[in-house]
Structure formats: C-alpha cells, structure tokens
Amino acid sequence: MSEVIKIANCSGFYGDNLSIAKKMVEGGPIDVLTGDYLAELTMTILYNQKMKRGENLGYVGTFLKQFRDVAKLCNDQKIKIVSNAGGLNPASMAAEVENIIKELNLDLKVAYIDGDDLMPRLDELSSSGEKLKNIDKNNDLFSYEKKPLTANAYLGAWGIKEALDNGADVVICPRVTDAAVVIGPAAWKFNWSRNDYDQLAGALAAGHIIECGAQATGGNYSFFKEVPTFKDIGYPIAEINQDGSFIITKHPNTGGLVSVGTVTAQLLYEIGSPAYVNPDVISHFDTLKIEQEAEDRVFVSGCRGSSPPKDHKVCINLAGGFRNGTELLLTGLDIEEKAKLITETIFDSVGGKEQFDKVDIQLHRTDKENPESNEQAQAFLRIDVMSQNPDLVGRLFSAKIIELALANFPGWTGRSGVVPSGPYIEYWPALVDSKFIKEKVHFDGKTMEVIPTSQLDFEEVYYQKEPAEVKQITENPDTEIFFGDIFGTRSGDKGGCANLGVWSKNCLLYTSDAADDVRS
C-alpha cells in the first residue's frame, strides 16, 4: 500500500450530478470513492418515501444508478466505495447493491452500518432521563407538542474502519457525520488508534472540505472570477498522509479551481466555532496551515485534535404542522396603504389572525421612485400562515384570497407557486449521551458492535491553542472599495440553523479597521 490514500467525493447532496461518480473513477487514480447525500431535511424526504412507497425503501435510490456505472471499474481497480446513501434503510440499500453485483458477476463484498435510528428508542431514552433538548432553543423534546418523524444520531468513522478492516469493498452507511466517510478510510489505511487525535483531526478537516463536492473546487465561491472555467467542473480529491496532513486537488483537465481561497471558504462552511466537533475527535481548524503547493493542489497541515465529546449529535425532524400563503405584486403609488388594505381584508375574510399558530407578513419595497419599467414599479407583499389544523391553511384559505382579485386594491397581480403550501417540517438538533449509541456493522453474516471512543478508557486530551501573532499594518488614507473585493464569505446551514463564515484575502487585512468592523 502506498503512503497516501486518495479519497474522491462524487456527491455533495441528494440531487447532485449523477455523472460525477463515473468521472471520478475514470479521471485518474483514486483509492476510495465517497458520496454525501444526507442533508438534515433529506431524512424527511426518505421518511415520506418509506411511508408512501414501502417500508423496504427510505434510501437514496439514485446512488444505485451511480453504483451500477462504476461497479466494474471499482472492482477492477480495487477502489473502495463508502457512502451514506443508506439513509433510513441501509440494510435494504445494501441488498440492492448486492443484487447489482450479482447481476454484473463481480467480486465485491458489501457491509452496512446501522444504530443511528433512535425513533424506536425514544421511550427508553426518555425513561433514562435523556431530554434531547433543542441545542438552539433549550426546549425538552419530550414536553414538546409536535411529533418526531425521524431521529438519527450522527455516527462516526469507526464502524467504517471496522467494515474495511474485515474486507468490505462497499460500505453503506446511514446517518453518519459528513466527514466520517473520509475519516474511516484514512483510519483504515494507516491503522490509526482511537486516540491518534491529531491525525484524525486532519482527516476530519479533509472530509469537511470535500464533503460538499464542488464547493471546494470553485462552486459558490465569493471570488468566482478567479475560476478559469465552470465547464465540466472537477470534484475534490483529498490525498491524505499518515500524519493527517493532506492535499486537496481535482482530476486534471477539468474545470473549477483548487486554491487557498476555495479551501478556506469550505473550511468555514457550517461551523460555529474553530473547534469543530465530531464523535471521533474535535478538530481545531485554527491550527491549520494552508499553502498553495502547485496549480490546483493545496497542502493543508498542522491540524491539532482533542478528545471527542461524551455525547452524539442527533438530527430530529418533527411534523411541524401545515402552511399556506400568497405573494402579491403591488404597483404604483400608495404601496404601504395597498399592503395594509389587502392584509386586513384577507384576515377579516378568513376569521382573523389569532386562529393561526404563526403569521408572517413581509412587504418588500423593491419598487423605485421613478420606474423605467413595470418591474421597477413593483413591490411585493408576502403572507405566510401556519397551523396544526390543515383545514385552516388549506384550499379554503387560498380561495378566500383569490376571490378578492376583483374586489380590492388596484392592479391586483398574484404570483403562483412562490409560497410553499402543505405540511412542513421542524428541525430539532439535540444531543444524546454516547453511552446510548449502539452502532453495529453487518458484514459477511457477522454483526460487530462499535463502541464510541468517549465510552472507552482513553485519557482526555484537549489542545490548548497558543495565540497567533498577526503583524500589524500601517494604514494609508482611506480608499472606498467594496467589502467583497477583500473579504470572502461562505454560508452554511444545518436544517434551520445557518452560519456565515468570513475570511480576508490575507492575514494583514485581518488587522485592518475593516476587519474590526466585521468582528463588531
């Protein structure tokens, strides 16, 4: 085995480009092909799939097409496949993968992992004193009136390593952390121990960078004009070394860009702190050194790691209720009065605002004072209503709005299909004590239990960051430029919780007055 493991990612979400898997396998040498398909609310899509189409479903079906495209190539080139496309039903997904292997007469061995699904154990957890409090709101799940539909713990990487150690060629995962599909193969390759925290932290950083696909290679990049071409954009590859350092790159002759900027941007994605927490390790992103080694090759080193926490994060999706709404265009004079008139009339006709659980009214003044076109003359009024009672926000609510079309403000214009209607989901992030996690690997007729690191007898280690020295700069007279010319941003979300990461093009800008304005 070589001293580097090359891990390529072919998917950043359920709906990503299906052709990428084949392109990653055919585009150059790789050791592992990974794919991330599970955003938080994707779990409810898979839940609805099971409810409507059968209990044997609940996985990411499009992965099967990708697998069929690459199975023979991966078999011939000894490329491992690790994916979280198992979703809510990794066992069924594994069975479908095995059917394709038999059909193609290949010699690939399949493992699957489960133990993330906490729905059958909610009563047990409640009686054991677990509150599953909402991380953002501090509410107790079991005293909340809304019904959970899915509840899945984010499993770590050690089940994946166990499967690979036992000879699996394909590992089908359920809800694991996004980076676990990268950490697991790296830990397998180098036979890392549970407390090799610096190495694991490096692999976590690598996994975090490549897990959203083309976002690491120029997609959604603030300085998009630096990207030579977006045609046939290359997806990211992490070349991980035994010490946890790594190179981010892409296949040659593909579009996109791998630069210090694109890597930095993706490091800031979906994080709330430089100490990035996973069930296997805490990775301190503020210890990373990021260097441009060559064109489309960025070397990342120096990552420090700490012991993992004693709890696992849980993604819970609740049946939030039902919603409806409308969006109306208001044109010409007296926009505020028109908005007030139609809003009052709508709620008078349906029986008042008080009957709804939530009412959201937003008037967006996109109109201009002296418009040169009809579009410049328009503002838009958006009205959203939510209720646990589907009848209150159903077809009757829509009908009451439509029947005002000839009987209210002048110039009535509605926009259809803009405001979502029907059931809605409420995302509930929580923590559960890791002692309740029962992760299992199923392979070759055997079942192996994987105990979380925090439940093993390892000394707790927490890296204490040394303050970085940043040179002060001499500021010249002010010049007015756009903020976005010198600072980049990357937004990310976990369900209903969003973050915005901001970075400066160089360290000196970090000490400027402009950076102080950002921090304040």
Q: Where in this protein do the model-derived segments appear?
A:
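Catalytic or ion-translocation cores adjacent to nucleophile or general acid/base/metal-coordination motifs
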Residues: 103-118, 183-224
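Gly-rich Lys/Arg/Thr-decorated short loops/hinges at beta-loop-alpha junctions or inter-strand turns
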Residues: 2, 41-56, 118-146
